[in-house]
Amino acid sequence: MSKLSERNLKFETKQLHIGQETADPVTDARAVPIYATTSYVFHNSQHAADRFALKDAGNIYGRLTNPTEDVFEKRIAALEGGTAALAVASGAAAVSYALQALAKAGDNIVAAKTIYGGTYNWLEHTFSEYGVTTKFVDPDEENAFENAIDENTKAVFIESLGNPNSNIIDIEEVANIAHSHKIPLVIDSTFATPYLLRPFEYGADIVIHSATKFIGGHGTALGGVIVESGKFDWAASGKFPQFSEPNASYHGAVFTEAAPGAALVTYVRAILLRDTGATLSPFHAFMFLQGLETLSLRVERHVENALKVVDFLSKNPKVENVNHPSLPDSKYNALYKKYFPKGAGSIFTFEIKGDAETAKKFIDHLEVFSLLANVADVKSLAIHPASTTHSQLSEAELAEQGIKPNTIRLSIGTENIDDIIYDLQEAFDSLDD
């Protein structure tokens, strides 16, 4: 009989077992233990020295590794089809670490301008202070990515489903463009989850998630994760000496040699996480493992409910427009069919007939929906992006991202669909008062 780890397991089985195929070797506990420890005992002085020199893989200090986090990292890497993963303290930390690892002062990133407002703001206003500029392009414009890349571009960055309008970019096409310039495609796939989309299958090289969202699923823990495909040849590219040449802080260790197929993830852990410490809590790692165990079940219900809400809104006379790629008249419908046969998540926007005050009045009359800044919770959520999540953007930037004063973002939960639609209808009816 083959070992469980050697079998070609299906997604629903992997989300329960990978990383801990047998009971805990010390206690025989079936659940993954929470290892609440800051540090680890070395066998002897040589063992300690080898660990610090990256000659022997294993735990050194809690800022870098933790056994609970290790199970979570292995499981999410397996679900994405990657070679390695690194869990960190938030989705924002995952994005910033991945791009900081790739680009240095004088370099640039090419990014879709339809990304999450917080990421846009970090790239435009914060990362630029460190000498890394970002060229934001319209992903719907022909040759936009190709035309923006130059000799100093170190990555292309997109989202699998744009936040908040759920726009879709042709991942395969953009990956080919990036690879023709010997640079990686980095994709934030938070809204899709590995259950709906595995970007590595279409040529992406680095996948990022805010684990706070669907992975955790219950709005109870903050975290992020970086997953590496293992397919991008950092050495052959010639553009990433930080991975392929000796590192002075590790006495000449070369990450592409020390960690084949996981050079970027290892670099982020050994350098950036070591030095800046956005470490994931072991307790949050445990909660994310709990979330992963029901990921496919929850996402199926999220998608089912979302499609029914989209249908309801698209027929409502008080709705100006619904932004969801499943709609036949959506310009993203062909890409939706290509990349999302199981559905495109449950986060999308619509424009209500009226102005910003109309949108806010509608939101303020919702009761099943919660007004808060998170998404991808089992509870349904609503927010007015222009005055909250994307409020740091200028009017011009909001317009470029397709966010209008009357735009409302919904995150459809797993409640009974009748209760969700009733709540929305009650809010629409309140506009007549």
Where on the chain are the PLM-derived regions?
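Conserved PLP-enzyme active-site core in the AAT-like
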Residues: 4-7, 15, 19, 23, ...
